[in-house]
Each structure stands twice: as structure tokens, then as C-alpha cells.
């Protein structure tokens, strides 16, 4: 600990993920990205430093400019080859987002965030202020650059003329890289003498604390070294070469900063990438200067994107020095105290983000005159033309725009499917769509006495899915039955039973009204209303459905225990399709099957992102977790032959679930009794409620799938997709089949399965999205396979209902994962010191956060009461009332900043493997 008190460290956090998260927040407060054209860049404030005669002034604008390309920085140090006793430049470290150091055995250490010592930054500032700067140097070789730089050194009295030749030979020495060190006996820092022969340092070399830390970090805390990041460097990377060496005949440290006019490949560099910047740091051996750390400080500076932009555009030394000062202002100093815990260090990250926020804010600029035109409505914003929710003011204008935007890609929607990844996605999504279809089909049959069941749901999913894949604007959406629709079907069936109405005929009239409603909404471009549905309403909706799932699961289990109670003795049992009276072990086995299915599905879900087995195997097992769980528990039930369990009712072939009660075509005037005329017109009310549910799920799902972070290029169509989904549902009701909606989790899973990830831009960096296979074939094939599954009656009929209850419970529990409301409810029972470090905790007072949570809980309770009464049909209408509540009432109670933290969309699109995280955590919507 004593050594730590001799130095202060600077904590640098150039984390790409942190920067991206910060940019997302800063966009809300007029953040301007730094990757902008040169013409829009505001001139930096130059220090009042006069240009010297030797500053290389560019005669034309540099072609080097800030771009979105990745940066690669390489640090080479002058070393002594122990075997051949000759000097050479050795690659000591490189930066590809993160820092990677070369170990003594010639193997790269693990990538890590750069840390810098306080004195190294002070020394860097000192040498920068007296350095030589050559901007837009028109040289294409290392020798040419070295000659120009040494001439400038002499002109500015940085070095003596007699030192020129020695330094020139040194700069052009042989270069070695990681693979070359394996053939050497070792290297060590060397000091260049006047004769050109290396010498040992004049003073005994005692590694300083920062060098020890550097070596320890290079060796890594783990025994497993990192492979070289060379192959992971993206093409067209902006490359910087930093050279650090010791020369005993120099009087003082000298720095040369070179910006090439054209980025060109230089010989002897580890990569054939064009070099844009060259930094040379040379100086005499001194006990207070560690040139390795000085070089690391310079290299880290060149990886920082704000300084890199300035370095690309600077026209004078003053601008670079000003940017360096700004870099130092954003650096945190860790005082020499006792070693803190890791948790304490994490508290520094928000402080660093705040410093970065201020650094990224643009300087005040003159108002753009075009801004006033845009505010007056005279000119559209740059992205308005492509906004699918922008209203045109014409009848069916949005629908026509969707067709014109999306259908020109129709041919590519076919050709883009010629990829093995699409075939793999078809297999995966088939099981992801089949499992809930069978589960909801079985439960729907239970709720409606088999007036609709598995066969109707499978056929409806297949037919509507095929049509949507062929005609939809966003074919990556997966249509299916969902929890909210199941709740409505149960409520409407109860309503019809209590009023002596034919349920299946009433659905047909609802279908008529659905078609009329969707035509009117699409005609007047009503899809724009989805923008007013915030996370507040989505989470109440999702939480309610999750509670219903969980409640229904245990309600069904209790009913099984009531039908087959546990008794001390039983009469002899004759196994029949459905025995009458109590049966031994039926209730207990049903409990085991339900709990076993739930636990297996949860375990396999977590296993997907665990650290066991190779990643591909984990993902396969995790992605097929639900069907695997069903299969295992069906086998368990099959092997237990002497205990009865209620099975899924599936008709043989293309038959309706209850052929004695209905056929495939529903007569709108009534099947067995005359359907009352008043109900034909009154059906518009339940039709409106169904429309609200489908509108909410489908439009919000389209918003989530079409997020800009997913980098889809073909666009989407809210109006066209809504017309298809609701219209097909209305027609399906005439055939006694369920209406469907776009399902959020399944659609996000489909999009993820078709996303092609590029190689990571650097060691430790996250892989970037390369493209998304936007095509129609995967959805088409999945729908066909779901339709063919109706022929699997011998297999489906062996599934116990208790297994489906386990899947129902699984869907209810997992749906809570991405709901911030659930997290805030848990915080009600935690002391504030244990609250997480998230915006809605940090920026909002605890009691006001709990007040917001309480209001949501009250809304949730009201919805639950409505659902539990005969007025349960009105549930969607009561739900939609939370939208004006959020828009009109809550702003009177909470400040805008508080609402942004509590009701902001902070869900991120991520493809990184993180333990316990998947698609459920990304979407605050019901399954």
C-alpha cells in the first residue's frame, strides 16, 4: 500500500458501450454527434499561442477528417534484442477500442480499459506544449516523414544538428511484432548512444509503480491470454503510430506530431492499413520519466474520439493544445488512498459520464435560419420523409405510402432468403411459434368448451401467417395468439353464456365490425396514435397479463385438486379416457408435471446465457427450451402408466374441435337459434375492444422491431400491416377461427435470428450488426409448418394439460423480466442504500418514485377489478384510459425530467450474451 501513496492515478474510461449509452441520453438535450462533415464543425478555440516559423502550415484542406471508421493505435518502443544484441522497434501495445499489451513471452494480454498515471499526463502536457507539429505533411514513406520531422526538430532547437543522423538511423530500424518475439530470447528497453550502440541505463533501472501496474495488466489476471486482435480490426481503420525511445545524447524530451495529408500505408507497420497520424517521443533517460507510460498516455489520447476529431481538423498548434486541456479536464484522478472495493469504483462511472456529457456538448453556434422555417411548418425535418407514422393529410395516404415504400423490395425479399441462416431461423421460429399456439389452443378450448381449440388456432395461425408473409410490409413480424386476446375470449364467452347468445355467431359479427373499423382507421391514418402510448401504459398492460397468467395457472391446479382430491383410500379404478370420481395420484402428478415443466423451461432459459458449454450449443438448448421442457415432461407422463392425467384435446385431421356444436363456416344469422338483431349492431362495442388490443400489440411490436439500432433498411408499414392483421382476423371470425395479432417476443426473436453480426471491431468490443435478412420466406415456411402440425394429432394428444399450465406459468413469470414497474415494486421493500444505480433512482426522489409506482399499482388494481366482474369485456377500454391519464394528469404531479426517467424507453437492442437476459428483458409487452 505504501507504493500506492507515491503516485496518483487517472482513471480513463474510454468505454464504447458507455459512450453509446451516453449519446442516447444526450440526444434528448440537443447533443450533436462529432462525426459530422467538416463544413459543419465549429472552429475550436485556439490557445493564444503564436505560430512559429517552423509550424508546417497546410496549403489546402486536409483530407483527414473525422469519420465513423474505427481507430487503431499502435505503440512501438525502442528495445534491445538479447540474442543478437541489436536495437529494434518492438510493438509494445495496441488499441482497438480497448488496450492490449504484449507480455514478455510474446503473447497478447487480455483487453482492458486504459488507465493513466497522473504524472504521465502532466509530462505529456509539457512535451505537447513544446512539441513540433507537422500538419498535412505530403509524404508517403516513413523515411520521408522522419527526414521532415528531424529537420523541424533542428529548426526549433529541439535537437542538435549532430544528433540528426543517429536519430534518423534509429527511426528507420527494424521492427518486430508479437510473432517475431517467439524466436528471440527476450527484449528489454535500451538507450541509444552517440555511436549508435545500445547501452544500459546510467542509473540502475527500478521499475516504477506505473510500470509494474502496466506489466501486471499486460500479464493479465487470468492465465488465459487473449488472441491477437489483428484480424478483428475492421477495414478502413484510421491508424496512428506512436514511437517511444530513449537516447542518452538528447538534452530534453522531444515530441513530434505528424498528420499526413493523405492516409498512406507505411512500411514495417504491423498492418497494411493507411497511417493518418505519427507521434514520436524521444528523450534522455531520467529517473522521473517512464517513456513507456508517456507513450501509453499519448496513444490513449489518440484513441479518444473528441481529440481525434480535433486532430483531424486542427489548423494550428493552439487547437491541439486546447483539445488536450479539455481531455485533461475530463480525466478523473484517484487519490493515493487505501485500495477501494470494486463496488466503490463503480460509483465513479456516473461521474465520468457526466464529464463526457459536458465534453460532447457542442459549442454555442448561431441559430440555423432553417430552424425557424421548420418550426413554422414550412420545411420538414431531415427524417420526416421516411417516418412511416407521419400523416399525409390524404385519405389512405399512409397506406399508399407504405405500399410505395415497401413493395419495390419484393424481389429482394425472395432472393435475400437464399442463406443458411434463414433456414436455421425457420426451424427455430417454428418451435417458438408452435409451443404457444398449442398452449393457448388448449387453454382456449378449456375456456370455450372446445368451440375453438388447438385445430382452429393452428389453422388460423398458418393461413394468416402465409398471407401476411406474402403481403405484409414488415414480414419479420410473427402473427399469433396472445394472452390479452385469450382474456377477451373468456370474457366474451361468459357474456354470451349469461345472455343466452351463441358465442361463435357473436364473434362473426365482431369480425364484420372489425373490418369496417380498420378500414376507417387506416383511411384516416390512425396509426400515428401509437406514438402516444408510452411505457406507462405498456407496463400496466403487460403486468396485468402476467398476473392473469399466474393466477389462471394456480386456479387450474386448484380445480384439479378439487376434481381429484387426495384421499386416504380409493375404490378400484378402471382406466378410461376420463375416469369419474377421485383417481389416485392424479392431482399430485399434475402438480409435478406443472412445476417440472416450469422449472425446466426457466433453467434452460438461464442456461442459454450461462458460461457452460460452447456458445452455439448453449443457444440451441436455450432457444428450444420450451419444446424441450414439454417433450421431457410428456415422456415422464408416458412412463407413469397407472396414473390418469387430463390430456390436450386435438381432433383427428382437419376437423373442428367440437364438431357437434359447429362447422367450419359460421352462419351470421345463427346456428341453432336466431341471433338477435340488436346484438348484430351492439357487436360494434366488443369489436372496438378487440381492435384496441390488436392495435396495441401489433403497432407497438412494429415499433420495437423497427428500432433504428437494428439497422433494417427496407422499412416498415404501420398502416398496411394493421389493415392486414385486423382484416384477416375479421374474415377468420366468419370461419370460427381466432383473430391474431403481432406477438412481441416471437417477432423480436425472429428478427434476432435473422440478424447477421459482424466481427467485433476490437478485443473486448461488442460485435456490430452487419445486416438483417429482411425477407418473406422464413415467415412463409414457419406458417406452412405450423399448419402441417395439425397432422401431429397422435403426438399433441399425449400432452397433459398440466404441462401446458407449466408453460403458462413460465410465460407469466418471464414476462415480468423487462417490466420496470415490477422492479420498482421490489424497491418498495428495499432500503434506499440497496437501490440500483439507474436513472429513475438517481434522478428522482425516492418518495416520488414510489408515488409514481403507487399510481400504476392503483391503475393495475382497477383493471383487475374490472377483469373480475361481469364488466370484464370493458377491460381494453379501461386500459386505454391510462393514456390520457399519463398525458394529462401525471405532468401536473411530476416534473418533465422525472417523467423521462420513470417513463422513458430505455430498453436497448442487444445481442451480447449476458447471464439471465434475453428477448423478454427487451420488451415491456405481454407474451
Curated annotation (Swiss-Prot):
Region listing for Interaction with ANK1, in residue ranges: 190-199
Disulfide bond is among the record's keywords: no
Disordered: annotated segments: 367-390
Side of membrane Cytoplasmic, spans: 1-420, 474-476, 524-535, 608-618, 701-716, 754-776, 817-854, 886-927
Region (Dimerization arm): 317-370
Tissue: Kidney.
Molecular-function GO terms, alphabetical: actin binding; ankyrin binding; bicarbonate transmembrane transporter activity; chloride transmembrane transporter activity; chloride:bicarbonate antiporter activity; enzyme binding; hemoglobin binding; protein homodimerization activity
Phosphoserine, modified sites: 18, 199, 222
InterPro entries attached to this UniProt entry: Anion_exchange (IPR001717), Anion_exchange_1 (IPR002977), Anion_exchange_CS (IPR018241), Band3_cytoplasmic_dom (IPR013769), HCO3_transpt-like_TM_dom (IPR011531), HCO3_transpt_euk (IPR003020), PTrfase/Anion_transptr (IPR016152)
Topology within the bilayer: Multi-pass membrane protein
Alphabetized PANTHER family for the sequence: ANION EXCHANGE PROTEIN, BAND 3 ANION TRANSPORT PROTEIN
Protein name, per record: Band 3 anion transport protein
Native species: Rattus norvegicus (Rat)
Gene: Slc4a1
Amino acid at each position: 500500500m505504501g507504493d500506492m501513496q507515491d503516485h496518483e492515478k487517472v482513471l480513463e474510461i474510454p468505454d464504447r458501450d458507455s459512450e453509446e449509452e451516453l449519446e442516447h441520453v444526450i440526444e434528448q438535450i440537443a447533443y450533436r454527434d462529432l462525426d459530422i462533415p467538416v463544413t459543419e464543425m465549429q472552429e475550436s478555440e485556439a490557445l493564444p499561442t503564436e505560430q512559429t516559423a517552423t509550424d508546417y502550415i497546410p496549403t489546402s484542406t486536409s483530407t483527414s477528417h473525422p469519420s465513423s471508421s474505427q481507430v487503431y493505435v499502435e505503440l512501438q518502443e525502442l528495445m534491445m534484442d538479447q540474442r543478437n544484441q541489436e536495437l529494434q522497434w518492438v510493438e509494445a501495445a495496441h488499441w482497438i477500442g480497448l488496450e492490449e499489451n504484449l507480455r514478455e513471452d510474446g503473447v497478447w494480454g487480455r483487453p482492458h480499459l486504459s488507465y493513466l498515471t497522473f504524472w504521465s499526463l502532466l509530462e505529456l502536457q509539457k512535451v505537447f506544449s513544446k512539441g513540433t507539429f507537422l500538419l498535412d505533411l505530403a509524404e508517403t514513406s516513413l523515411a520521408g516523414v522522419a527526414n521532415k520531422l528531424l529537420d523541424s526538430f533542428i529548426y526549433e532547437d529541439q535537437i542538435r544538428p549532430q544528433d540528426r543522423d543517429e536519430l534518423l538511423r534509429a527511426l528507420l530500424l527494424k521492427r518486430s511484432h508479437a510473432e517475431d518475439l517467439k524466436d528471440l530470447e527476450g527484449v528489454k528497453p535500451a538507450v541509444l548512444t552517440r555511436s549508435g550502440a545500445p547501452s544500459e541505463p546510467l542509473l540502475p533501472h527500478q521499475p516504477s509503480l506505473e510500470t509494474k501496474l502496466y506489466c501486471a495488466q499486460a500479464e493479465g489476471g487470468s492465465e488465459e491470454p487473449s488472441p491477437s486482435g489483428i484480424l478483428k480490426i475492421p477495414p478502413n481503420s484510421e491508424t496512428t503510430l506512436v514511437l517511444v525511445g530513449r537516447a542518452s545524447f538528447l538534452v530534453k524530451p522531444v515530441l513530434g506530431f505528424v498528420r499526413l495529408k493523405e492516409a498512406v500505408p507505411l512500411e514495417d507497420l504491423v498492418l497494411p492499413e493507411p497511417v493518418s497520424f505519427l507521434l514520436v517521443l524521444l528523450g534522455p533517460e531520467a529517473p522521473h520519466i517512464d517513456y513507456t507510460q508517456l507513450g501509453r498516455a499519448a496513444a490513449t489520447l489518440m484513441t479518444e474520439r473528441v481529440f481525434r476529431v480535433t486532430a483531424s481538423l486542427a489548423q494550428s498548434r493552439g487547437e491541439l493544445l486546447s483539445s488536450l486541456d479539455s481531455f485533461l479536464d475530463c480525466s478523473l484522478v484517484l487519490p493515493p488512498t487505501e485500495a477501494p472495493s470494486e463496488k466503490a469504483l463503480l460509483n465513479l462511472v456516473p461521474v465520468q459520464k457526466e464529464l463526457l456529457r459536458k465534453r460532447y456538448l457542442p459549442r454555442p453556434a448561431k441559430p440555423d435560419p432553417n430552424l425557424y422555417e421548420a418550426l413554422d411548418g414550412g420545411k420538414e425535418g431531415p427524417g420526416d420523409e421516411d417516418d412511416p407514422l407521419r400523416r399525409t393529410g390524404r385519405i389512405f395516404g399512409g397506406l399508399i405510402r407504405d405500399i410505395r415504400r415497401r413493395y419495390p423490395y419484393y424481389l429482394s425479399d425472395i432472393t435475400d432468403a437464399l442463406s443458411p441462416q434463414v433456414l436455421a431461423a425457420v426451424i427455430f421460429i417454428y418451435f417458438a411459434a408452435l409451443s404457444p399456439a398449442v398452449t393457448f389452443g388448449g387453454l382456449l378450448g378449456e375456456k370455450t368448451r372446445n368451440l375453438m381449440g388447438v385445430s382452429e388456432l393452428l389453422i388460423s395461425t398458418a393461413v394468416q401467417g402465409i398471407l401476411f408473409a406474402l403481403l405484409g410490409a414488415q414480414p419479420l413480424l410473427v402473427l399469433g395468439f396472445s394472452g390479452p386476446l385469450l382474456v377477451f375470449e373468456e370474457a366474451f364467452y361468459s357474456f354470451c353464456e349469461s345472455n343466452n347468445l351463441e358465442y361463435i355467431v357473436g364473434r362473426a359479427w365482431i369480425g364484420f365490425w372489425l373490418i369496417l373499423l380498420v378500414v376507417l382507421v387506416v383511411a384516416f391514418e390512425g396509426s400515428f396514435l401509437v406514438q402516444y402510448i408510452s411505457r406507462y401504459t405498456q407496463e400496466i398492460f403487460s403486468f396485468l397479463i402476467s398476473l392473469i397468467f399466474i393466477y389462471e395457472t394456480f386456479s387450474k391446479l386448484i380445480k384439479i385438486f378439487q376434481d381429484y382430491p387426495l384421499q386416504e383410500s380409493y375404490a378400484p379404478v378402471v382406466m378410461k379416457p376420463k375416469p369419474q370420481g377421485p383417481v389416485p395420484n392424479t392431482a399430485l402428478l399434475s402438480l409435478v408435471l406443472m412445476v417440472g415443466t416450469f422449472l425446466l423451461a426457466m433453467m434452460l432459459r438461464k442456461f442459454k446465457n450461462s458460461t457452460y458449454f460452447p456458445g452455439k450449443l448453449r443457444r440451441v438448448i436455450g432457444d428450444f427450451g420450451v419444446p424441450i421442457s414439454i417433450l421431457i415432461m410428456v415422456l415422464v407422463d408416458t412412463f407413469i402408466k397407472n396414473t390418469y392425467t387430463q390430456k390436450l384435446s386435438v381432433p383427428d385431421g382437419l376437423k373442428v374441435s367440437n364438431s357437434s356444436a359447429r362447422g367450419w363456416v359460421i352462419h351470421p344469422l345463427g346456428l341453432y337459434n336466431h341471433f338477435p338483431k340488436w346484438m348484430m349492431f351492439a357487436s360494434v362495442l366488443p369489436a372496438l375492444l378487440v381492435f384496441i388490443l390488436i392495435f396495441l400489440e401489433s403497432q407497438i411490436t412494429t415499433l420495437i422491431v423497427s428500432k433504428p439500432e437494428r439497422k433494417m433498411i427496407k422499412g416498415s408499414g404501420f398502416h398496411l400491416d394493421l389493415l392486414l392483421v385486423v382484416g384477416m382476423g375479421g374474415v377468420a371470425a366468419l370461419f370460427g377461427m381466432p383473430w391474431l395479432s403481432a406477438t412481441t417476443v416471437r417477432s423480436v426473436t425472429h428478427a434476432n435470428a435473422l440478424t447477421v453480426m459482424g466481427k467485433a471491431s476490437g478485443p473486448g468490443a461488442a460485435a456490430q450488426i452487419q445486416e438483417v435478412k429482411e425477407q418473406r420466406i422464413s415467415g412463409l415456411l414457419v406458417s406452412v409448418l405450423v399448419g402441417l402440425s395439425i397432422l401431429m394429432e397422435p403426438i399433441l394428444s399425449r400432452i397433459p394439460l398440466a404441462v401446458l399450465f407449466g408453460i403458462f406459468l413460465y410465460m407469466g413469470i418471464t414476462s415480468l423480466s423487462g417490466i420496470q414497474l415490477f422492479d420498482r415494486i421490489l424497491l418498495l421493500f428495499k432500503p434506499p442504500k440497496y437501490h440500483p444505480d439507474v436513472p429513475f433512482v438517481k434522478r428522482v426522489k425516492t418518495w416520488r418514485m414510489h408515488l409514481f409506482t403507487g399510481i400504476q399499482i392503483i391503475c393495475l388494481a382497477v383493471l383487475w377489478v374490472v377483469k373480475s366482474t361481469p364488466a370484464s369485456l370493458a377491460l381494453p377500454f379501461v386500459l386505454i384510459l391510462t393514456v390520457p391519464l399519463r398525458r394529462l394528469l401525471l405532468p401536473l404531479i411530476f416534473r418533465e425530467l422525472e417523467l423521462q426517467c420513470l417513463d422513458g424507453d430505455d430498453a436497448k437492442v442487444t445481442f451480447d450474451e449476458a447471464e439471465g437476459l434475453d428477448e423478454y428483458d427487451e420488451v415491456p409487452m405481454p407474451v
